[in-house]
């Protein structure tokens, strides 16, 4: 299967299935000398692991990471880093009946059309558990960014149509509720709404917003490797994501150029902007301002409510999906968005090291 590799210089390859022996990732292109231990990675994996509240899948997994290669005496060696997480509580029998029909909203039908075969247990390769490898690799990328003074923060901006109030925005509150929302009142409203949908076997979606601070200027390229285009590709590669916008996004289509243009001014001896409608990217290249983008996350397709579908014999049938599923994926997808953002930024930052001859000469000057 092609399409499991992401990145050009800081490159990752994820592997594994939801109900296989395990999942993981191989990272190639990480510099030697980065302090790294399993705890650094585990902290991020713990943010996405299942079973943390009644609003996520009840499947319980420790998701304990094992570093198999690329680290010696607490530092990266510059060789490929291999990370593995072993599945422990898979219940494949829950999925035996879906082998013969296509679940609405899932990749069952398209997998069969493309490969002529599919691992129906929990979605196989298209399961949300595939993101374990992304988050594990993203933890390493975030350590690199931290060394450069760059910080990534994502949160649930909206769930089930209930949005946060920016006047009540408190990022510390994000970790105090089950929804990763930085607004306590909004989280309480989501709780009530989610419970009402769960009671009838339905699910809900939402919007994740991500902010990058400390970003230097000049990262990205003007054509096919644009910073915003690469971010869009990275975020849209997350299974549940169906939309992406950066800066003012689609709202920019409703205003004039006079309003949309970010006017330049001098700030503390450097070029700055009066506004940030662009979301920190101009011409595919970072402008030094905060990078702000949003991702639309669809409702979890696995629901127990009765739905119409088709089986492999071409017959119309009605189904109710069994198994352990998330009534919403937004809260657990927040850390995945952060991880894919980190991977994109590190890859482009490393790419930028050869953009200017004067800097190449400065680097190698003895």
UniProtKB/Swiss-Prot annotation:
Catalysed reactions listed for this entry: 5-O-(1-carboxyvinyl)-3-phosphoshikimate = chorismate + phosphate
UniProt entry tagged with the keyword Lyase: yes
Pathway assigned to this chain's UniProt record: Metabolic intermediate biosynthesis; chorismate biosynthesis; chorismate from D-erythrose 4-phosphate and phosphoenolpyruvate: step 7/7
Entry's EC annotation: 4.2.3.5
Membrane-spanning residues: none
UniProt keyword Repeat, yes or no: no
A GO cellular-component term linked to this record: cytosol
InterPro entries: Chorismate_synth (IPR000453), Chorismate_synth_AroC_sf (IPR035904), Chorismate_synthase_CS (IPR020541)
Required cofactor names: FMNH2
Residues holding FMN: 125-127, 283, 298-302, 324
One GO BP: amino acid biosynthetic process
Binding site for NADP(+): 48
Cofactor binding annotation: Reduced FMN (FMNH(2)).
Any GO molecular function: chorismate synthase activity
Keywords: Amino-acid biosynthesis, Aromatic amino acid biosynthesis, FAD, Flavoprotein, FMN, Lyase, NADP
Function: This reaction introduces a second double bond into the aromatic ring system.
Family: Belongs to the chorismate synthase family.
Subunit structure: Homotetramer.
Entry protein name: Chorismate synthase
């Amino acid at each position: 299967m092609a399409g499991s590799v992401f990145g050009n210089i800081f490159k990752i390859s994820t592997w594994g299935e939801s109900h296989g022996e395990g999942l993981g990732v191989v990272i190639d292109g990480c510099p030697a000398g980065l302090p790294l231990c399993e705890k650094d990675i585990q902290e991020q994996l713990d943010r996405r692991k299942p079973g943390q509240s009644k609003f996520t899948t009840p499947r319980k997994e420790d998701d304990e990471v094992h570093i198999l290669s690329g680290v010696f005496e607490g530092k990266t060696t510059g060789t490929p880093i291999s990370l593995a997480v072993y599945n422990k509580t898979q219940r494949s029998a829950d999925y035996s009946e879906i082998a013969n029909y296509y679940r609405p909203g899932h990749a069952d039908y398209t997998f069969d059309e493309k490969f002529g075969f599919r691992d129906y247990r929990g979605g196989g390769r298209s399961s949300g558990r595939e993101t374990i490898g992304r988050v594990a690799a993203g933890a390493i990328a975030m350590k690199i960014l931290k060394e450069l003074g760059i910080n990534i923060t994502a949160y649930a901006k909206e769930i089930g149509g209930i949005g946060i109030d920016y006047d009540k925005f408190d990022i510390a509150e994000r970790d105090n509720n089950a929804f990763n929302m930085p607004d306590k009142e909004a989280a309480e409203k989501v709780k009530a709404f989610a419970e009402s949908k769960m009671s009838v076997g339905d699910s809900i979606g939402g919007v994740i917003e991500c902010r990058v601070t400390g970003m230097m200027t000049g990262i990205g390229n003007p054509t096919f490797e644009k910073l915003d285009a690469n971010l869009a590709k990275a975020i849209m590669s997350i299974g549940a994501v169906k939309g992406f916008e950066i800066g003012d996004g689609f709202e920019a289509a409703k205003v004039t150029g006079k309003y949309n243009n970010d006017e330049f001014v001098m700030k503390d001896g450097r070029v700055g902007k009066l506004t940030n409608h662009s979301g920190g990217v101009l011409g595919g290249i970072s402008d030094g301002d905060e990078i702000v983008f949003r991702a639309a996350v669809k409702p979890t397709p696995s629901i127990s409510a009765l739905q119409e579908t088709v089986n492999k014999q071409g017959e119309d049938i009605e189904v109710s999906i069994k198994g352990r599923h998330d009534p919403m994926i937004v809260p657990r997808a927040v850390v995945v968005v952060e991880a894919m953002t980190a991977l994109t930024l590190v890859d482009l930052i490393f790419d930028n090291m050869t953009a200017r001859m004067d800097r190449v000469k400065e680097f190698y000057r003895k």
